[in-house]
From Swiss-Prot:
SUPFAM superfamilies: Ribosomal protein L1. InterPro entries: Ribosom_uL1_bac-type, Ribosomal_uL1, Ribosomal_uL1-like, Ribosomal_uL1/biogenesis, Ribosomal_uL1_3-a/b-sand, Ribosomal_uL1_CS. It comes from Shewanella frigidimarina (strain NCIMB 400). Coiled coil: none annotated. PROSITE patterns: RIBOSOMAL_L1. Binds directly to 23S rRNA. The L1 stalk is quite mobile in the ribosome, and is involved in E site tRNA release. Protein L1 is also a translational repressor protein, it controls the translation of the L11 operon by binding to its mRNA. Keywords: Repressor, Ribonucleoprotein, Ribosomal protein, RNA-binding, rRNA-binding, Translation regulation, tRNA-binding. Part of the 50S ribosomal subunit. GO terms for molecular function: rRNA binding; structural constituent of ribosome; tRNA binding. This is Large ribosomal subunit protein uL1. One of its GO terms (biological process) is translation.
Length: 233
């Protein structure tokens, strides 16, 4: 049997895998265990009561967290004319059409989010094999294909997170950094859960939000008592 690292031993001793933690207690515990030499992210996994094999039960969208994610987000926008000027004014790092597409094809991928105006999708569509596998392909459901590119840029910069269930019906995303206050992480999580509930497929049956767990980049997952979230009350 492999020998546990000191960090793993501490996590095993401190985290009760059978317990549902109050959100405040969970955040304090994760912050105590976050001993990496970098500022760890706080990630969340939400198990949804959906059948991910059925397209009409898949959950996908985006929401702006009230306290952001703590990340500096670089935004690329495919658009032209007045929209290009508006995107630059809103803070986009890269703006263009065919010229920007050529940079992407050449491997210049120094951005975290891609936004496109509808008229630019003829250009972006040819980049599907590059952007798709990286989760960067613009999509109307996440607000990244829109005539109002300036607003989309502002949302991305303000801490918008995109979510999409995996093949097991689980949503994985981030809700901030371990340096955030307990209240900030709690409110970000509540905002995400609220958005997920609004995105509930009409055909989904039974309990929708089945389990919520939060973890740090290098830490163990801690299951959350949903009753400790305002959204659940």
């Amino acid at each position: 049997m492999a020998k546990l690292t000191k960090r793993a031993r501490v996590i095993r001793e401190k985290v009760d895998a059978t317990k549902l933690y109050d959100i405040n207690e969970a955040v304090v515990l994760l912050q105590e265990l976050a001993t990496a030499k970098f500022v760890e992210s706080v990630d969340v996994a939400v198990n949804l009561g959906i059948d991910p094999r059925k397209s009409d039960q898949n959950v996908r969208g985006a929401t702006v967290l009230p306290h952001g994610t703590g990340r500096d987000v670089r935004v690329a926008v495919f658009t032209q004319g007045a929209n290009a000027e508006a995107a630059i004014a809103a803070g986009a790092e890269l703006v263009g059409m065919e010229d920007l597409a050529e940079k992407v094809k050449a491997g210049e991928m120094n951005f975290d989010v891609v936004i496109a105006s509808p008229d630019a999708m003829r250009v972006v569509g040819m980049l599907g094999q590059i952007l798709g596998p990286r989760g960067l392909m613009p999509n109307p459901k996440t607000g990244t294909v829109t005539p109002n590119v300036a607003e989309a840029v502002k949302n991305a910069k303000a801490g918008q997170v995109r979510y999409r269930n995996d093949k097991n019906g689980i949503i994985h995303t981030t809700i901030g950094k371990v340096t955030f206050t307990t209240e900030q992480l709690k409110e970000n999580l509540e905002s995400l859960v609220s958005a997920l509930k609004k995105a509930k497929p009409a055909v989904a049956k039974g309990i929708y939000v089945k389990k919520i767990s939060i973890s740090t980049t290098m830490g163990a997952g801690v299951a959350i008592d949903q009753g400790s979230l305002e959204e659940a009350k």
